[in-house]
UniProtKB/Swiss-Prot annotation:
The gene is tpm. The keyword NADP does not apply. It is an enzyme of class 2 (transferase). Belongs to the class I-like SAM-binding methyltransferase superfamily. TPMT family. GO terms for molecular function: thiopurine S-methyltransferase activity. Gene3D superfamilies: Vaccinia Virus protein VP39. This is Thiopurine S-methyltransferase. It comes from Xanthomonas euvesicatoria pv. vesicatoria (strain 85-10).
Length: 218
């Protein structure tokens, strides 16, 4: 899986992963992080998720990172926003009010771009990556975050042999294997969602659940 895979999906409109509303699990569990309003929240592989607007409405500053210029443009256009723009080594920056999106490769981020992020919201990033890329993703995106950073991680679990990702199945054992060395991991919720995801059932998936984790940097 390379950058062209994701760029092509946006160009062709193959974006079934994009939700048309704010994720209810975010609204339900975000306050468990107990963040100050002024906290800056990193949203890796953000696409054009409406969750960023919700986070901004809570008083947070939001930093999204997205590879596709089309996704970034659509995010601001659909909100009727005209962002200011500038370039850096990390990519092209789009800024409107409390929301900033860096259009660039998350795997090429400079640590300085994340220096003032005190929280991370990962709904569609970790599950978008095959197993062989996840450790590198943590080293690139999570490791540079400040000590005692907070996070909300949302994953999917299903029999991986029944469906090719993305999104990929990331079960609790794998979450702990990835995060336990640097993060305290607490599962906040785990529930079956197969009835709410007919596209998975149509592809022959026999079981599907989602899990929500609170992360606390050590």
């Amino acid at each position: 899986m390379d950058t062209n895979f994701w760029l092509e999906r946006w160009q062709l409109g193959h974006t079934g992963f994009h939700q048309q509303e704010v994720l209810p699990l975010l609204q339900k569990h975000w306050h468990a992080l107990d963040l100050p309003k002024e906290a800056r929240v990193l949203v890796p592989l953000c696409g054009k998720t409406l969750d960023m607007h919700w986070l901004a409405a809570q008083g947070h500053r939001v930093l999204g990172v997205e590879l596709s210029p089309l996704a970034v443009t659509q995010f601001f256009d659909e909100a009727g926003l005209q962002p200011q723009r500038h370039s850096s080594a990390a990519g092209e920056h789009f800024i409107a009010g409390p929301i900033e999106i860096i259009c660039g490769d998350a795997f090429a981020l400079d640590a300085s771009a994340l220096a003032d992020c005190t929280a991370v919201y990962d709904r569609a990033a970790l599950v978008a990556l095959p197993a062989e890329l996840r450790q590198h993703y943590l080293q690139t995106v999570y490791a540079p975050l400040p000590t005692h950073c907070h996070g909300l991680l949302i994953t999917l679990e299903y029999p991986q042999a029944e469906k090719a990702g993305p999104p990929f199945s990331v079960d609790a054992t794998h979450v702990h294997a990835l995060f336990d060395s640097a993060w305290q991991v607490d599962q906040l919720e785990h529930r079956d969602i197969l009835d709410q995801e007919p596209r998975f059932r149509d592809e022959g998936v026999t079981g599907l659940s989602t899990a929500v984790y609170r992360l606390q940097g050590r």
